[in-house]
C-alpha cells in the first residue's frame, strides 16, 4: 500500500482495463476469481486474456493466488486505484496526479489537477490496514453481510463521505466543496491551511474554541454527531477559521450511544486547547442543549437511524393542516377551487334528481320535479306555466311509451330476414296447394287449425310496419349487444400432454446450459492445463539434468 505510481496508466490499453474490470466484477462473489470466469466476463474481441493477465500481474495491479482447492486472481489496491483514476480522467475531473499530502489509518491524500490546472484534493480510502482491523465491529458499512472485501468497504466509506460532504456543503457548513467520486476515491476542494495538530500558536484561542464548540452544536441540531471531532480532522486557515474534514464515522443523534459520542467530541477539544494553548473554559455544550432543527441524519442515512425510528417519527409528527394544503396546491395542474367543486356538485346532483323523477313519472308514480335550487324556491308559479309544464310532461310520457313499444317490436327485428324467408316459403306452398286443387282458405283447414289462420292474418296486417325502411329506422334505437353464441370461439387442443411438453423444454434448456458451461471452461482452462504441462516438463528436465550431473 505505498504511493500510487501512475506512470503506467497512460500506456494501458482498452483490453487491459477491460480485463481489470472483469476481475473487479468477479470479486463481487469470489475471493479468488478463476481465469475461466475472467475470460468469459471480459470477452475480448481478439482473445489473449491470459497474456493480459500476466502483464497485469507483472505490474502488481492484480495478484495470482493458488490454494489447495482453487487458483485464480484477485484485485489489488493499485489496480483499484487505476480503475478509479481512469474513470475520473474520462470524466475530465482529474488530468494529473501530484504529491502525497497525508497518510492516515483510513486514507491517503494526493494533490490532483484538471485540464485547466485547477488543483483539488484526492482522497483514496484504505480500509483494512494493520492499525484499523476492527472496522467490521465498529462500523456498520457491511450491515448484514458476514464476509466483505476490504475494497468494497473502502468504496462504501467513500460513498458515505461524499454524501455527508455534499449535504453539509449545501447547508453552509465549513467543509470542503465536493467535486466528484468514483469507487473508493473522492475529489474535493483543496483547502489552503494546516491541520490544527500542527499549529502551536494562535492569536485568539478563545474564538477558535468557541467556533469549534458552536460547530459541534450546529451539527447536533441537524441530527448528526461527528464521532471523531479532534485536532487531526480540523484545518485552520490564515484567518483562523475552522474547516471540518473526515466524515465517514458520523452517527445520528438517535443512536443509542449518541450522548457518549457527543461528550467525547467535546472532551477532545477541551483537552487539546488545555494542553496546546493552556486555555480552559467553563462553558461547553452538553447533549441536553441540542434543539433539533433539521433531519440531516435521515437524508444521508446516518449510523444509528433505523427504519423503525423513521416510522416512529412519522407517527409522532404527522402532517398538519398546513402541510396538507401545500400538498393539495402542488398536487396537479387540473385541481379545482372549492367554489368550482361545489357548483359542479350541485349541477350533477340536480341532473341526477331530474332524471330519477322523470323515470318515476314514466312508471306511473307521480313525484314533483326537484330541479335547480332557484326552481325549488319559485313555488308561486302562474297557471299558464303550470299547464305548459304538464303538457310537456304528457308529451314526454307519450314519447317514452312509443319508445317502449318500439323496443318491444325490436326484439323480433333481428329475426326479420328469417321470418321473411319463411313467409315467402309459405306463400309458395299455398300457391302449390291451390294449383293442386286444394284451396288455401278451405273450411277443412279452418276447422283443423283456426289459430294459424288468425296469426297469418295478423302478420299481414303488421307487415307494412316491418318492411326494410322501418327496420333501418328502428335499428337506431337498438342497444347493440354481443350474442353469446356468436362470440364463442373454438379453443385448439393439442394431442401432446402438457407434462410431456414441459419435460422436453426443460431437457432442452438444461442441455443448452451445459453446453455453454462446457465451452466456457474449455476456452478458459486450456491454457491452465498447458501451464501445468510445462511445469511438469520443466521438473522432469531439471531432474534429468541433476541425475546426469551426479553420474547416475
Curated annotation (Swiss-Prot):
Changing residue 380 to D: Increases time spent in metaphase. It is found in: Cytoplasm. A motif (Nuclear export signal) lies at residues 399-408. The modification Phosphoserine is found at residues 332, 335, 337, 350, 362, 380, 382, 385, 390, 412, 417, 442, 548. Its cofactor is Mg(2+). GO terms for biological process: maturation of SSU-rRNA; positive regulation of ribosomal small subunit export from nucleus; positive regulation of rRNA processing; protein autophosphorylation; regulation of mitotic metaphase/anaphase transition; ribosomal small subunit biogenesis. One of its GO terms (cellular component) is cytosol. Its EC number is 2.7.11.1. Pfam families: RIO1 (PF01163), Rio2_N (PF09202). This is Serine/threonine-protein kinase RIO2. It comes from Homo sapiens (Human). The gene is RIOK2.
Amino acid at each position: 500500500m505505498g504511493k500510487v505510481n501512475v506512470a503506467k496508466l497512460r500506456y494501458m490499453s482498452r483490453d487491459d482495463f477491460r480485463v481489470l474490470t472483469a476481475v473487479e466484477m468477479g470479486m463481487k462473489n469470489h475471493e479468488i476469481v478463476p481465469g475461466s470466469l475472467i475470460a468469459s466476463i471480459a470477452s475480448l474481441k481478439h482473445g489473449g486474456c491470459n497474456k493480459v493477465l500476466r502483464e497485469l500481474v507483472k505490474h502488481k495491479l492484480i495478484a495470482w493466488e493458488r490454494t489447495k482447492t482453487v487458483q485464480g486472481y484477485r484485485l489489488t489496491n493499485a489496480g483499484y486505484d487505476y480503475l478509479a483514476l481512469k474513470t475520473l480522467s474520462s470524466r475530465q475531473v482529474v488530468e494529473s496526479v501530484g504529491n502525497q499530502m497525508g497518510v492516515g489509518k483510513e486514507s491517503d491524500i494526493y494533490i490532483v489537477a484538471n485540464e485547466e490546472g485547477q488543483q483539488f484534493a484526492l482522497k483514496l480510502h484504505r480500509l483494512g490496514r494493520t492499525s484499523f482491523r476492527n472496522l467490521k465491529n465498529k462500523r456498520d458499512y457491511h450491515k448484514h453481510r458476514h464476509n466483505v472485501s476490504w475494497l468494497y468497504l473502502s468504496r462504501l466509506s467513500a460513498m458515505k463521505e461524499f454524501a455527508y460532504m455534499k449535504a453539509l456543503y449545501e447547508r453552509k457548513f465549513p467543509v470542503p466543496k465536493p467535486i466528484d467520486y468514483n469507487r473508493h476515491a473522492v475529489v474535493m476542494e483543496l483547502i489552503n491551511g494546516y491541520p490544527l495538530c500542527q499549529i502551536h500558536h494562535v492569536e485568539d484561542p478563545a474564538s477558535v474554541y468557541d467556533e469549534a464548540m458552536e460547530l459541534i452544536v450546529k451539527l447536533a441540531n441537524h441530527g448528526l454527531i461527528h464521532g471523531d471531532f479532534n485536532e487531526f480532522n480540523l484545518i485552520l486557515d490564515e484567518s483562523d477559521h475552522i474547516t471540518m474534514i473526515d466524515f465517514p464515522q458520523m452517527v445520528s443523534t438517535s443512536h443509542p450511544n449518541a450522548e457518549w459520542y457527543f461528550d467525547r467530541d467535546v472532551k477532545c477539544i477541551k483537552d487539546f486547547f488545555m494542553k496546546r494553548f493552556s486555555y480552559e473554559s467553563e462553558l461547553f455544550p452538553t447533549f441536553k442543549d441540542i434543539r433539533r432543527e433539521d433531519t440531516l441524519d435521515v437524508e444521508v442515512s446516518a449510523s444509528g437511524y433505523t427504519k423503525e425510528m423513521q416510522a416512529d417519527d412519522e407517527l409522532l409528527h404527522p402532517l398538519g393542516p398546513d402541510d396538507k394544503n401545500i400538498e393539495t396546491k402542488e398536487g396537479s395542474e387540473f385541481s379545482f377551487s372549492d367554489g368550482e367543486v361545489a357548483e359542479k356538485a350541485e349541477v350533477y346532483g340536480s341532473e341526477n334528481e331530474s332524471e330519477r323523477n322523470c323515470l318515476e313519472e314514466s312508471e306511473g308514480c307521480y313525484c314533483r320535479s326537484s330541479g335547480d335550487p332557484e326552481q325549488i324556491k319559485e313555488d308561486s308559479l302562474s297557471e299558464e306555466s303550470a299547464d305548459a309544464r304538464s303538457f310537456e310532461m304528457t308529451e314526454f310520457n307519450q314519447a317514452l311509451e312509443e319508445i317502449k313499444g318500439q323496443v318491444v317490436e325490436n326484439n323480433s327485428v333481428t329475426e326479420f330476414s328469417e321470418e321473411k324467408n319463411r313467409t315467402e316459403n309459405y306463400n309458395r306452398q299455398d300457391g302449390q296447394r291451390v294449383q293442386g286443387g286444394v284451396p288455401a282458405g278451405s273450411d277443412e283447414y279452418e276447422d283443423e287449425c283456426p289459430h294459424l289462420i288468425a296469426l297469418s292474418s295478423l302478420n299481414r296486417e303488421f307487415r307494412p310496419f316491418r318492411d326494410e325502411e322501418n327496420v333501418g329506422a328502428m335499428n337506431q334505437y337498438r342497444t347493440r349487444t354481443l350474442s353469446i353464441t356468436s362470440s364463442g370461439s373454438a379453443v385448439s387442443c393439442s394431442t401432446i400432454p402438457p407434462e410431456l411438453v414441459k419435460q422436453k423444454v426443460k431437457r432442452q434448456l438444461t442441455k443448452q446450459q451445459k453446453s455453454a458451461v462446457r465451452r466456457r471452461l474449455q476456452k478458459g482452462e486450456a491454457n491452465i492445463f498447458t501451464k501445468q504441462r510445462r511445469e511438469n516438463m520443466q521438473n522432469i528436465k531439471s531432474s534429468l539434468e541433476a541425475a546426469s550431473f551426479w553420474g547416475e
